[in-house]
Design a protein with these regions (language model features):
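N-terminal "arm"/small-domain region of PLP-dependent enzymes with the aminotransferase-like
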Residues: 1-41, 134-135, 169
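PLP-dependent aminotransferase-like
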Residues: 80-141
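PLP-dependent aminotransferase class I/II
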Residues: 23-28, 46, 96, 198-282
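Conserved PLP-binding catalytic core of the aspartate aminotransferase-like
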Residues: 274-305
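PLP-dependent enzyme catalytic core of the Aspartate aminotransferase-like
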Residues: 304-305, 316-346
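Helix C-cap/helix->beta junction micro-motif
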Residues: 104, 134, 166-167, 196, ...
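Short loop-beta-helix segment that forms the pyridoxal 5′-phosphate
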Residues: 43, 55-77
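Active-site phosphate-binding strand-loop segment of PLP-dependent enzymes
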Residues: 118-181
Length: 346
């Protein structure tokens, strides 16, 4: 269901998780160590400092930001808030939406819009017709999408949200990977969230700052929606480590710029290398690549090289032979291509 299963295998290079290849900023590592000194104290139940600092980036009020123990906790809270009778999901996409919908609303009718391989899994305008016909209570969109890494075109996303606003459909726009595309300022809906009644933007520190073990995500939406979502979250849901690390992360925009450069270079290199090996590589705007090959057990073969990749055959809409790899540092990308070449040549 997910990448990152390094606990049942001897892994040296984990390409299965889509986190920043630069790793944890050194200043954030230091703050995490310092946070241990505060472990004997009750933390701020409202995490006010982190909320203020985060809201300031988007010129919002702290009451328009909701924090969770990772974006996953927020997805579950959103599903409990609305308990939809009908939901619409893209496929393939992140399986966590379906998991949370079923957990919060077991009788919900889940409608799927299947992204098409012949379109390189890009979202197309016919989704608008499906929304009009089905009139879902809630729609989850991911930009860039997971597992293929493509951004949704801004004009199309604007149309979708406009239609959903008229129909009363809640739209959750998952932007957890958007920062690493380098296009956050021009594409994020967080900056204009007050223009929308029923839009919730999801974001996370996990992928951007390579801290999946800390668990810190946030939702941005109108205050009335934020208040409703908070009612479905536990108190003290952010650890002192999450609060202090999150506040420190916000200070490091230079780290983001360097990350985007490395990711763009690495994506070009890795995509070309996989194509040279005869694989079908799908377009990506993000820090991971979806590809297809005839080697149905490529994941298992790479484990012999102590390399872990994501087998995407369990994604709805994909089959055996689809794999996802994260962009990592150049020497690691080289190592992956070398290992795959050895497998291809037998």
């Amino acid at each position: 269901m997910h990448g990152g299963d390094i606990y049942r295998n001897n892994i040296h290079f984990d390409f299965s998780v889509n986190i920043n290849p630069l790793g944890v900023p050194s200043e954030v590592q230091w703050v995490l160590t310092e946070a241990a000194l505060h472990a004997n104290k009750y933390l701020d139940i409202y995490h006010e400092q982190l909320a203020r600092d985060t809201a300031a980036i988007f010129d919002l009020l702290e009451t328009e930001v909701v924090f969770g123990n990772g974006a996953s906790e927020l997805i579950m809270a959103i599903c409990h808030t609305f308990t939809p009778k009908k939901a619409m999901l893209l496929a393939p996409s992140f399986s966590g939406y379906e998991h949370c919908i079923i957990g919060a609303a077991p009788d919900c009718n889940i409608i799927y819009y299947y992204l098409r391989e012949e379109d390189d899994f890009a979202l197309k305008e016919d989704l608008l017709d499906k929304i009009k016909d089905e009139k879902p209570n809630i729609l989850f969109l991911t930009t860039p999408n997971n597992p293929n890494g493509l951004l949704i075109e801004k004009a199309l996303l604007d149309e979708i949200i406009s239609l959903c606003e008229k129909q009363g459909t809640v739209v959750v726009v998952d932007e957890c990977f958007l920062t690493l595309t380098g296009k956050e300022k021009e594409l994020s809906f967080a900056y204009n969230i007050r223009n929308y009644k029923n839009v919730i933007v999801l974001r996370a520190f996990t992928k951007t700052f390579a801290i999946p073990g800390v668990r810190i995500g946030y939702a941005i939406c109108r205050q009335s929606l934020a208040d409703a979502i908070k009612m479905h979250l536990p108190e003290w849901n952010l650890s002192i480590f999450a609060q202090m690390a999150g506040a420190e992360c916000l200070k490091h925009q230079d780290y983001i710029l360097e990350s985007v450069r490395i990711i763009n270079d690495g994506r070009t290199y890795l995509s070309a290398g996989l194509r040279d090996l005869g694989f079908k590589v799908y377009p990506s705007d993000s820090n991971y690549i979806l590809f297809k090959c005839d080697i149905s057990d490529l994941k298992e073969k790479l484990l012999e090289f102590n390399i872990l990749i994501r087998d995407c055959s369990d994604f709805k809409g994909l089959t055996k032979g689809f794999y996802r790899v994260a962009i990592k540092q150049h020497n690691e990308n080289e190592g992956l291509l070398s290992a795959i070449e050895s497998i291809v040549k037998g």
